[in-house]
């Protein structure tokens, strides 16, 4: 087994790291003559946003490489970059890891013009405020914004080595008695991130379903693949 499945157990033990995820054109030979195929899939790239902690995140590919896959790119637009709770659901060093994370208020990957005066008396930006900032007066506080957000949000990500895996993800970390909409980004049945004649890194499926804390999600990770899930309370 090799990277990136080993990194959460080695380098990331020392703190956050910049891994520049989000590569959707995984055949680098189509960009430069000397390029090679990456050991990854699109869903592996999405899973990195959750399994690797990096509070300053990026989308590392060219904009034109995202255009054919805007439905998958939606996860990059949605996912947070900093967390107030992290749960490691399953893991085997160097082989695979599945992580669930709950975002901090100020970490969701959205932009806001401004939110007025914060608790310390300074003007500031709270990035989760986009859709309701206009409704608050100049003396709005971070606490005001937090209580105005009606949804509980979680993200789950998984990555694997060269071995395909089918996993059953327990959602018992969700609030009991609350329904959530799960958006599941998963490797397709014929996906593969191994650079051989079966290479098919851009094959994925996106499904939505209603779940609770008693639910389990069955997902497949292709060789060198992964998955990502966004969960939003209804």
Language-model regions, residue ranges each:
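A general structural signal for short secondary-structure junctions and capping/turn motifs
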Residues: 9-10, 40-42, 50, 100-102, ...
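Short secondary-structure junctions and interdomain/linker hinges
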Residues: 54-59, 82-86, 228
């Amino acid at each position: 087994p090799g990277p990136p499945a080993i990194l959460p157990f080695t380098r990331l033990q020392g703190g956050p790291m910049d891994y520049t995820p989000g590569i959707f054109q995984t055949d680098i030979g189509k960009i430069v003559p000397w390029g090679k195929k990456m050991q990854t899939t699109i869903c592996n790239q999405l899973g990195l946003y959750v399994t690797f902690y990096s509070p300053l995140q990026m989308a590392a590919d060219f904009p034109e490489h995202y255009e054919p896959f805007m439905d998958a790119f939606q996860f990059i637009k949605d996912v947070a970059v900093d967390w107030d709770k992290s749960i490691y659901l399953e893991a085997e060093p160097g082989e695979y890891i599945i992580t669930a994370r709950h975002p901090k208020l100020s970490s969701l990957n959205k932009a806001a013009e401004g939110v007025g005066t914060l608790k310390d008396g300074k003007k500031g930006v709270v990035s989760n405020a986009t859709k309701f900032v206009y409704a608050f007066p100049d003396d709005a506080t971070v606490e005001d914004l937090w209580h105005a957000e009606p949804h509980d949000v979680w993200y789950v990500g998984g990555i694997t080595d060269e071995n395909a895996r089918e996993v059953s993800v327990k959602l018992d970390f969700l609030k009991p008695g609350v329904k959530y909409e799960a958006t599941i980004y998963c490797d397709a049945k014929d996906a593969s991130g191994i650079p051989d004649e079966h290479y098919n890194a851009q094959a994925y499926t996106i499904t939505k379903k209603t779940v609770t804390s008693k639910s389990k999600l069955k997902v497949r990770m292709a060789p060198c693949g992964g998955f990502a899930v966004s969960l939003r309370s209804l």
